[in-house]
């Protein structure tokens, strides 16, 4: 998986720590977005925030880590951004996985900082 990651996908993967499974069957990890995160380049100078597309991508990349399979995003069925994530913040990413059909996964991703919802996304991803 690492060899085929996009630059941002690899950056996101390298920032995932404390991966664990909850009693409810969801998966959680923490992610540190220090100022060296490449997603901040040009987004926005002087006030860097994590781009929304990176937050959606984090859900897919985390699902790959959990499933140990390479995935490609087929669709984003729902997405809501509620609060930006700034340089220096640590986020918690939680995903719920459901195999909709063979090799097609529904991913529900929820990203929070200090308990506050930053983004929620529902995507479908296929095994490559």
What is the predicted function of each stretch?
Residues 14-26, 87, 96-128:
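HotDog/MaoC-like acyl-thioester-processing domains
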Residues 52, 95:
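Residue-level signal for inorganic ion chemistry
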Residues 8-50:
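Catalytic strand-loop segment that frames the active site of acyl-thioester-processing enzymes
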Residues 60-94, 104:
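Hydrophobic beta-strand-centered segment that forms part of the acyl-chain substrate-binding groove
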Residues 2-4, 84:
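Short boundary/loop segments of OB/S1/cold-shock single-stranded nucleic-acid-binding domains
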């Amino acid at each position: 998986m690492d060899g085929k990651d996009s630059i941002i996908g690899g950056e996101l993967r390298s920032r995932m720590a404390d991966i664990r499974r909850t009693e409810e069957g969801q998966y959680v990890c923490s992610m540190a977005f220090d100022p060296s995160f490449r997603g901040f380049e040009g987004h926005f100078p002087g006030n860097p925030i994590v781009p929304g597309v990176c937050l959606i991508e984090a859900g897919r990349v985390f699902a790959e880590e959990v499933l140990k399979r390479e995935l490609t995003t087929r669709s984003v069925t729902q997405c809501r951004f509620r609060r930006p994530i700034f340089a220096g913040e640590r986020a918690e990413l939680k995903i719920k996985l459901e195999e909709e059909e063979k090799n097609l996964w529904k991913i529900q991703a929820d990203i929070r900082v200090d308990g506050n919802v930053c983004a929620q996304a529902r995507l479908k991803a296929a095994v490559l």
